[in-house]
Amino acid sequence: GIDIPANDDSRGARAVAIRAQVSKTGEELGRPLRLLIGKPGLDGHSNGAEQIAVKGRDVGFEIVYEGIRLTPEQIAKAALEEGVHLIGLSVLSGSHLEMVEDVFARLDQVGLKGLPVVIGGIIPESDAILLKERGIAAVYTPKDIDMNGIMVDILNLIRKANDLKPVEAA
């Protein structure tokens, strides 16, 4: 099953406020906000990706969860076919630098250069800096436990990519 952190607030005031902002942003963009959550590579540990998918759904994002052991080609194809606004990758195998490079190359090939991509995993600070330099919009690690805060971050990354002003933290 999927473990939800003890500090989860999926039905509290903060989550309700985030849900309203997700809905408002969808209206501004003319369609509901969609996130693709994927686990590229051979890593089979899916708890973090599933927690993000569940929390995203709880605050109003449409979630496309493609599962584990995906190729970068499968991720890019799904992003194109599903019309997602942002991709969230979960990489715990240590291959995050190589995987991101390949995912970006595949996104470019299908015409999705510039689509925001975030990544989560056990990522050293030095690698997080490199990932951001290479175009990753945000890096999350196990110490990032504020799920509502992550959802606001994701919402604002989508807003920024679509030339909308950021929302205030809920």
List each model region and its residues.
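Domain-level signal for soluble alpha/beta catalytic cores
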Residues: 1-170
